[in-house]
Curated annotation (Swiss-Prot):
Belongs to the somatotropin/prolactin family. Keywords: Disulfide bond, Glycoprotein, Hormone, Secreted, Signal. SUPFAM superfamilies: 4-helical cytokines. GO terms for cellular component: extracellular space. It comes from the Eukaryota. InterPro entries: 4_helix_cytokine-like_core (IPR009079), Somatotropin/Prolactin (IPR001400), Somatotropin_CS (IPR018116). Its main location: secreted. This is Somatolactin. Pituitary gland. One of its GO terms (molecular function) is growth hormone receptor binding. It holds the Pfam family Hormone_1. It is found in: Secreted. One of its GO terms (biological process) is growth hormone receptor signaling pathway.
Amino acid sequence: MHNWKGVWLCSLFLTFGQLWNGILLAYPLDCKDEQGSYTRCTSISLEKLLDRAIQHAELLYRVSEESCTIFEDNFAPFSLVSQRSRNFNSCYTKGLRLPSSKSEAQQVSDKWLLHSVLVLVQSWIEPFVYLQRTLDTYNSLPGSLVNKTKWVSDKLPSLEQGIVVLIRKMLHEGLITTDFQQSVIEIEPSPEITDSSARDYMILNCFRKDAHKMETFLKLLKCRQIKKLNCY
């Protein structure tokens, strides 16, 4: 049962200012000093901070692709189910008002791109906690898949904290507000996907798509901020 449905996105459907209040004191894990304490990253250049965030997003996307492949290979004839599920417009984050393509992302501000990455990262933290629990119920699941999903679950908060620092560094604002408001959406599994393994695969596949968006948005931000060239 997906007991978490309709719950884990609730916090996302607040103003971005409210989201910011909840993470105001967060710092990126990569900013630990030798003693293990956190710094404010004030000595780290914007370019390096963007590079770190991009590297996180690239790895998340790569690991998500590998996880999808492992899942498909170990659930024959699951490849047929997975191929069908790829075509379903049933991802849990489909209700978020975010750029849906690179061309759309090119039309929005830096603030909105940062907002979009942060919301995407936050939206997947709880589903991966759920996924860790449900994967534990499988009898013959490859250890590599368990390790990869755990790695993603551990890295998402790190990327979240890094985006918070980028927001401070790039926008020079202690509080960010936008007109982003949405009502709570009741998240339901697609009626076409009734098998629990297919639903779990859908989570992995949807995250793969969103991880690619995170990577794309961050690379566009770096192009705008660092290269100052034509980013189209």
